[in-house]
Every structure is written in C-alpha cells, then in structure tokens.
Curated annotation (Swiss-Prot):
Domain PB1: 77-164
Position of sequence motif EAR-like (transcriptional repression): 16-20
Domain note: The N-terminal half of the protein contains two conserved domains I and II. Domain I includes a slightly degenerated ERF-associated amphiphilic repression (EAR) motif which seems to be involved in the activity of transcriptional repression. Domain II is required for the correct degradation of the protein through the SCF-mediated ubiquitin-proteasome pathway. Interactions between Aux/IAA proteins and auxin response factors (ARFs) occur through their C-terminal dimerization domains III and IV.
Assigned keywords, A-Z: Auxin signaling pathway, Nucleus, Repressor, Transcription, Transcription regulation
PROSITE patterns: PB1
Organism: Arabidopsis thaliana
A GO BP annotation: auxin-activated signaling pathway
Protein name as annotated: Auxin-responsive protein IAA2
Subcellular compartments: Nucleus
Induction or repression: By auxin.
Length: 174
C-alpha cells in the first residue's frame, strides 16, 4: 500500500513474486514499507527471513516401502531352490517344514517323481540313479545326510539332485 503511494502506479496486479506459495500478504506489505524507508534499497538484515527455521524432518510413511507379508517373518521360513539334472525347471521348498532327512527325501521324490533311496554313511545312496546334494554357506557341495539335520537346515543354500554318475566326485564311496 505504501508502495502505491510513492509511485502512484498500480503495479500490484502485474507484480512477480519470488516467495513460496502460501505466504501471507502481511510479509509483502512489511517488505514494501521497508523499501520506502531506505530509499528503495533493502539492507542486508531486511533481506534475511525473520523466521530461520530448520527444514521439516522426513517422517517415514507407515507401510512404505511396501513389504510382502511373506518377507515380514524371515524366521518362520527358510526357502531353498531345488534343481534336478535333466529337469527344465527349478522348485523352491521350505526346509523348516521338514523335521528330518527322510521327510525331506520323500518330498523330493514326490516333487520330481524319482527314486532317491535312503542314505547310508558307508555306502551313500547306493541303488539309486540320483543323489541329493546341497551347497552350504561356504559354497561347498556336499551330500544330503552328511551332517546333522539342524546344521544342514541352517547352512543349506541350494539343493541339487544329481545323476548318480556325476556324484562320485563328491563321495569316494560311490
């Protein structure tokens, strides 16, 4: 308003504003009055914002980023990939659903429709065309049944059902 009295021009309609949207008219009026008082030159203190506030803190939106319910409880499942020599597809199984090796081997036999047989420490998987192996956390391939079940279920990364002719490299008894 004081600005209009000095110049006697109505420039308010065409005025370009560099402020953020939502600022009040009161701040504009105070700046206009201060320009008139200092011969249309603003002082350094007048150019600074009166309210030096910190930027608003970023709060995380609840539910973002989206997490699948299957990934929320990682302790309740332990999925590993299962491959079979000659099969064109992979499967995944949850090791926590099985309590011991016989249950796991039975599930693998049903899944791939093959006969694996039972494991014997001295003979390995004799009498079977396929041998179940697994990769542990260190990247070593071992026969399923070589270690106690708890150690196996915690260290297994992948399962592979190999042809019996490929397995002698893992176990010298075959």
């Amino acid at each position: 308003m004081a600005y209009e009295k000095v110049n006697e021009l109505n420039l308010k309609d065409t005025e370009l504003c560099l402020g953020l949207p939502g600022r009040t008219e009161k701040i504009k009026e105070e700046q206009e009055v201060s320009c008139v008082k200092s011969n249309n030159k603003r002082l350094f203190e007048e150019t600074r914002d009166e309210e030096e506030s910190t930027p608003p803190t970023k709060t995380q939106i609840v539910g973002w980023p989206p997490v699948r319910s299957s990934r929320k409880n990682n302790n309740s499942v332990s999925y590993v990939k299962v491959s079979m020599d000659g099969a064109p597809y992979l499967r995944k199984i949850d090791l926590k659903t099985y309590k011991n090796y016989p249950e796991l081997l039975k599930a693998l036999e049903n899944m791939f429709k093959v006969m694996i047989g039972e494991y014997c420490e001295r003979e390995g998987y004799k009498g079977s065309g396929f041998v179940p192996t697994y990769e542990d956390k260190d990247g070593d391939w071992m026969l399923v049944g070589d270690v106690p079940w708890d150690m196996f279920s915690s260290s297994c990364k992948r399962l592979r059902i190999m042809k019996g002719s490929d397995a002698p490299a893992l176990d010298s008894s075959l």
